[in-house]
Amino acid sequence: TYRPKIKVPLSALDKAVEVTGITAVLAFWIYLAINYTALPDIIPTHYGGGGKADGYGDKISILGLPAVATVIYIAITILNRFPHVFNYPSEITPENALNQYTLMTRMMRWLKLVVVVIFGSIAYQTIATANSADPELGSWFLPVTMLLLYGTIFYLSLIHI
């Protein structure tokens, strides 16, 4: 089916979320660069559902966190330029396209910020507890992560129904 190709204008809040996201990505890399040399050679590389470290590896593996977060951020940023390719719960018509595209790109914008915050939090906790005898993210981490991801989707879906 035909879907109009429309450039979605950004609101002031959308622009603020974009700036916050870019700032978070840059802060993530800077924080890691500042703290990398102080890390022990072996650090936690995986955490179980309860937040306890259950996998260890070379400290260079921590670079995967900002790398993956950056790739996801860039990929969603690029994808957001093509809202007509997304899946929508209702049919897209010329009359509702701008509204639907705006809602979807806004949700994706918030989600990419949430992803960067989650990955940054994992890196922060890994650095903070790397020298600990019992490194952990904390039992709160998984529930908070799920709340951030699904809460963002639910809230943005709910307020725009």
State the predicted function of each range.
Residues 159-161:
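Conserved small/polar residues in nucleotide/adenosyl-binding loops
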Residues 57-73, 142-149:
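Alpha-helical transmembrane segments
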Residues 9-24:
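Alpha-helical transmembrane segments and their helix-start/interface "positive-inside/aromatic belt" motifs
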Residues 78-95:
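Membrane-helix interface/capping segments
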Residues 17-21, 75-77, 105-117:
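Select subsegments of transmembrane alpha-helices in polytopic membrane proteins
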Residues 128-150:
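Hydrophobic alpha-helical transmembrane segments and immediately flanking/interface helices
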Residues 114-132:
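Alpha-helical transmembrane segments and their membrane-interface junctions
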Residues 32-64:
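Active-site and channel-lining beta-strand-loop segments
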